[in-house]
Amino acid sequence: MRKVFDIATIHKFERHLLERMLKLNTMSTYLRMLRAVYNRALLAGLTGYVPGLFKHVYTGTRADVKRALPPAEMGQALDISASLHRELKEAQIWFALLFLLRGMPFADLARLRKCDFKDGVITYRRQKTGRQIRVHVTEEAAELIRRCADRRTDSPYLLNILGDENCRFPLGRREEYRHYQQVLRRFNRKLKLLAAALRLGGKLSSYTARHTWATTAFHTRVAVGVISNALGHSSVKVTETYLKPFENEMLDRTNKKIIAYVKKCSIRQG
């Protein structure tokens, strides 16, 4: 444990993430998770204190990239009646569920258990933060759940996302993670094809539905604190990172309104 938590090893891990061509926010997530493990190990006396251990690696968040779709394009993506190849249709249904279930992360959707869905409500714990989330399932979402339900009697999963015909359930944590990573890569590839098939101007990824839910709520004047709770974020600061790219747009629109109002008043005075 002590050999893991030294400055050279942390820098080596960051270089490994860079070599994998990961985006800065993804790298930051891995490094912040490692920092959380270090802090717990430190409290438990399993490792020693290393000053500035994470000082020179990137643990921030960038908010300069918009991942959300405009409402009209999101509406197209949710239109399940569109004629598509079977595999693209499956990806579209999963994507729609991410949005309809209050911007649920794909990591949580894939791991939902059959026992999590009861009396029209899904109750689960977020993989990332451990926070318990309760989501009322709309009729539209319930129909999509029925369409992609995991009907294997030995499978604990609500949806037919993880595992294949050769799987023996229950999956171990390592095997579940391996299956999830494989499915996630395929899902993102299919979403790119789906965006092209639907002729969407924006890109689709497993994050798009969640970001679109958050930004749509923001533009319809839902309080940031409410959005944060709905998404199960660890703090409002995380939510603000989602929404920061849209702040300048809103400020620019406000500025134009103020200028127009002042000019209108000056004309009346004249």
PLM regions: where:
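Short, polar N-cap/turn motifs at the start of nucleic acid-interacting alpha helices
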Residues: 115-121, 201-202, 222-241, 268-270
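Conserved tyrosine-mediated DNA breakage-rejoining catalytic core shared by Y-recombinases
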Residues: 4, 55, 111-147, 163-164
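DNA/chromatin major-groove-contacting recognition/catalytic segments
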Residues: 136-139, 148, 244-270
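Basic, Lys/Arg- and aromatic-enriched nucleic-acid-binding interface segment
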Residues: 24, 28, 49-106, 110
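N-terminal core-binding DNA-recognition domain of tyrosine recombinases/integrases
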Residues: 1-65, 80
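Active-site/catalytic core of tyrosine-dependent DNA strand-transfer enzymes
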Residues: 74, 139-201
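Catalytic-site neighborhood detector that most strongly recognizes the C-terminal catalytic loop/helix
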Residues: 68, 126-130, 164, 231-256
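Short, basic (Lys/Arg/His-rich) helix/loop patches that form interaction surfaces
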Residues: 79, 83-86, 179-181, 185-229
